[in-house]
Regions:
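C-terminal and inter-domain tail/linker signature
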Residues: 1-153
């Protein structure tokens, strides 16, 4: 990849977070290849009849998770604090995601609490300029603590 390709990869990922900040899930998905992989490694939400895990495809699992997060945290936002890329289309991003809970989210009841949580996102952008893979990591225990969900086994 050329310097132009590296710049394009960063631009695509920056546009993704801009769309996320604007709650434009359709735009987030448009920036991804049709078969883009999706991995929210620590993600697991227990529902009444099923468990949603954070692995699959952007257009199925990713889209559902983003819409549900935005619905539960209507002021959800993000701040990109660091971004870097290489000539293979790999982009690493440190981003702080924050929001105030307005509805229950999975097993996390709504206490109206606010969270600020650092995340690491790893993207792979293909030669066509579309995101082919998204992987993200964060501290779920800290997220749940900030939202008042304390569990003792």
């Amino acid at each position: 990849m050329s310097v132009t390709s590296i710049t394009r990869s960063v631009e695509v990922v920056t546009a993704f977070f801009d769309a996320y900040r604007a709650h434009d899930v359709e735009r987030m998905v448009e920036l991804c290849a049709d078969n883009a992989d999706f991995h929210y490694v620590p993600f697991e939400v227990w529902g009444k009849q099923r468990v949603i895990r954070g692995g699959g495809k952007v257009r199925t699992i990713g889209k559902v998770i983003w819409r549900t997060l935005i619905d539960s945290f209507p002021d959800l936002t993000n701040e990109v604090t660091y971004i870097t890329s290489d000539d293979e289309g790999n982009v690493a991003v440190e981003v702080v995601i924050s929001g105030t809970q307005a509805k229950p989210f999975g097993s996390i009841g709504n206490q109206g609490l606010h969270y600020d949580l650092p995340h690491v996102f790893l993207f792979r952008v293909g030669k066509e300029g579309l995101i082919e893979e998204i992987t993200a990591y964060w501290d779920t225990a800290d997220w749940q603590r900030q939202l008042g969900r304390l569990e003792v086994d």
